[in-house]
Design a protein with these regions (language model features):
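Alpha-helical subdomain
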Residues: 1-34, 38, 42-194
């Protein structure tokens, strides 16, 4: 798109390409890959399925059940993926992961893509604290964080309001990236000792 004409679909596509490049560099150096809020992400079913990494997809049970039904209908193999039902707003996701076989002592790649904006600041902080406290020190966290002005714009769009009503979600967490976004991001990361 022409600069200034970008939309949310452009953001999602650019984010996916960028995250895929980071994942490609990291995947050979980890034992486990946790997709936090996996939704309909298909990374575990393509080339990465042959990486020898143990996959954990973490999301709400209803989303996972629908995804698994679609995967089965498409005859896509998924026995290498551990599905872990979690509500990030309520559950201790790392405890649920451990119950599913996750080993916190093994180097892990955590992907937290398109999730933080649906959580409160407290839920984001709690999730980051869990990863920091219980994951192996050499683990990697890839996450996206959104500008408050984007969240405000998305929240006003009628189509987004309908989707949020259907999913019983709200747009909540964001950061004030309008001025000096690098410093804002740096302060956020430092405040969580990441």
């Amino acid at each position: 798109p022409t600069p200034g004409d970008e939309n949310i679909a452009d953001l999602v596509a650019a984010r996916t390409v960028h995250f895929d490049s980071i994942i490609a560099r990291a995947i050979d150096h980890v034992d486990q890959f946790v997709l936090m809020g996996a939704g309909y992400d298909t990374r575990a079913y393509g080339e990465l399925a042959r990486s020898g990494v143990t996959f954990y997809e973490v999301d709400q049970a209803a989303v996972q059940n629908h995804k698994r039904a679609m995967i089965e209908a498409a005859n896509i193999r998924c026995e290498h993926v551990n599905f872990v039902p979690v509500d990030f707003g309520i559950d201790n996701f790392l405890s649920k992961l451990e119950q599913a076989g996750f080993d916190p002592s093994r180097k892990t790649l955590f992907l937290w893509e398109g999730v933080s904006l649906y959580l409160s600041a407290e839920q984001v902080a709690a999730t980051l604290a869990m990863v920091k406290q219980r994951a192996a020190p050499t683990s990697v966290l890839i996450a996206d964080l959104y500008a408050d002005r984007l969240i405000q714009t998305l929240g006003k769009a009628h189509a987004n309001q309908k989707v949020l009503e259907m999913t019983n979600e709200t747009l909540d967490f964001s950061l004030p990236f309008t001025n000096n976004w690098r410093q804002v991001l740096s302060n956020f990361v430092e405040s969580h000792s990441m």
